Amino acid sequence: CTPPRLLRPGGLPLESLEAVLGHVDVDKAVVSLLKDGERPKAPGMKYRHYAPKAPVTVITGAPEKSAQEILRRVGPTSGVICFEEFADLFREQEVHTLGPVGDKLVQAQRVFDALRTFDTSDVTEIFAQCPDNRGLGLAIGNRLKKAAGFHVVDGFEPPTLCL
């Protein structure tokens, strides 16, 4: 029997589905852009969605690390979507917050507003922090990554090699 497959994450987290159904496969279109010739299995899987006019880059990783990576990349005409705890780092940029790091319900409520608000702005690029994939984070991250056309920078620290 083929396990169930999550095509588009939403308000019911993957963990809740798995608690009832057992293992649930996550379709690759949830985490990456479909290649030319690949057919989407559900509406909204293939194309950029909810994308502002300015190009978006999503920075993944621990919140502190992703904030530092954004700080390293931003310029005076950049926009930033970040967690509330890091908004003060970006005093020279236009900033819209997702909410507190630990409150994915608030982040889910604010993600589209943060993206859309930049359409009335003169920013030339947007950098966005991304929550981890636990709980609603999978859906929030999916929406941010789709808006970015899956232009994602891994802000995770490289592993240390022990000799």
Enumerate the predicted regions with their spans.
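Active-site-adjacent structural elements in enzyme catalytic cores
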Residues: C1-L163
